[in-house]
Amino acid sequence: MKTWQGKRYWLVGASEGLGLALARQINAAGAEVVLSARSEARLAQAVAQMPGKASAVAMDVADSASVRSAAEAVGEVDGVVFLAGVYWPMKVQDWNADQVEAMCDVNFTGCARVVGAILPSMVARGQGHVVITGSLSGFRGLPGATGYAASKAGVMAMAESLYADLRGSGITVQLANPGFIRTRLTEKNDFSMPFLMEPEDAAREMFDLMQTDRFKASFPTVFSWLFRLSQFLPDWAYYRLFAPK
């Protein structure tokens, strides 16, 4: 079991939803938390909800200068958790270039910016903790998920490469792949969302992962098996199941 007392964690994308719920759990366990997101007003409200020592640094992960400035302001941390994300459901027939680019820039490139800003100091110290939020949608391409599924697949591959390179270095890398969570983002969906989780429940799954030495957790468990097993299906079977004509 990980010791949280005296630790300092930077949570990016923590002003609401999963990030806010996870910040509360980490903070309640004894770690100091620094919360980042774009909205200063939401960050102030989030910090007020923390049970322990907490602060906020506003940041836009789509802006490299903003990320560098925030990383300098945050300073040395024991761990960083990337939770920032944007989402629009979209079929390719309804292609919206601005939205597709935003999903890639925030969800994937934003993660690379944050990791790139914080990882060198961890490598120099020989210790640290990097937690990345993927998605069940990142295992294989899905209909109506243009931009989002691709961005999450990229994030998941990034986490796998980080894990491969940093094994034995003293830096722990972990990947959490949640399914549907009740947030402002999923309110946009006009389709059924099986096994829909509340942010607090998803945060508990993620926090449980962070207290272990495991690399990856995909949840809810039963629902996640559908996506994990889909990787072994031949294309004809996969698309007949997930994208019937």
Predicted regions and their residues:
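Conserved glycine-rich cofactor-binding loop
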Residues: 15-16
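Substrate-binding pocket helix/loop in short-chain dehydrogenase/reductase
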Residues: 91-104
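C-terminal helical subdomain
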Residues: 175, 191-225
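Conserved glycine-rich Rossmann-like NAD(P)H-binding loop of the short-chain dehydrogenase/reductase
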Residues: 29-46
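Residue(s) in the substrate-gating loop at a strand-loop-helix junction
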Residues: 135
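Active-site helix of classical SDR
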Residues: 115, 151
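Active-site loop immediately N-terminal to the catalytic Tyr-X3-Lys motif
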Residues: 93, 142-146
